[in-house]
Amino acid sequence: MSEIHSEQDLAHTLRRFAQFRVSGVIVTSGQPPEALVNECVHQHIPVVGINRQPTIPGVDYVCSDNAAGAELAADQLLRSGCRRFGWLNTHPSTWAGRMRGEAFSRALQTRGVNIERDLAHLACPEEGYVGGEQAAALAGEVPEGIFCANAQLACGFLDGMRQRGKQAPEDYQLIGFDNTPPTAQYSYQLTTLHQDVAAISRQALTRLQERAADPLQPSRTTWVEVTLIHRRTSPFVI
């Protein structure tokens, strides 16, 4: 297992791969160094990317179905009576985050929402929890229904809005993505899209084995179903 934060980390990781003669690599970071993936392909090491943009030939990808998740979020907020919407994400974003935002915009538009007028892109100066908290402080008029790119942003936004005296779902509704353990805690009770980590892991290992058996096969992308978990910040609507 390796974490790469610098060019030195990248060089060290590549040396370790050569030293231990690894038989396969799974890249899980939201923004993994492309040089690492390309070098593995060059050395004929099978690579599977998880939740990353499918762009490199000879690499297989396993991704949560971000577009379907965004549609579930749009449907939930519309059924709940929301008419003004917000999208919260960092800039620059991971590929998965960008895909979720673009799909959310499309889903609203195809359901009759004027996205030029009724969809706000909320400013998020930093990543993670702190970024969500800052976005809440910077937000002017708060949209009725907000979709967040990930759970950390959503939790930070919830706490930031509490500091402004606003609560979900009384003052606005909020849906996150990831369903990490903190989202189920009593203080958050975040309605969120659930990524099936076990299914993603199984598919990644299967693709790795298949790539090792047939290195020249075309690249494939597997989309893993996501589900909407209803909690307090956007309750279930019949």
Listing of model-derived features with the role each one plays in the protein:
Residues A74-F85:
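Glycine-rich phosphate/diphosphate-binding loops that line cofactor/substrate pockets in enzymes
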Residues M1-D75, A135-E141:
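Alpha-helical recognition/docking segments in bacterial nutrient-uptake
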Residues M1-D9, R52, V62-L72, L88-Q134, ...:
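Hinge/beta->alpha junction and helix N-cap segments in small-molecule ligand-binding domains
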Residues S23, P46, R83, N114, ...:
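Residue-level detector of anion-binding/catalytic polar loops
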Residues V25, V47, Q76-L77, F104, ...:
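Residue-level signal for nonpolar/aromatic packing positions in well-ordered secondary structure
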Residues V41, Q109, R162:
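Anion (oxyanion) recognition and catalysis
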Residues L14, R21-S29, R84-N89, H121-L122, ...:
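Periplasmic-binding protein-like
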Residues E116, Q134-I238:
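Flexible loop/turn connectors
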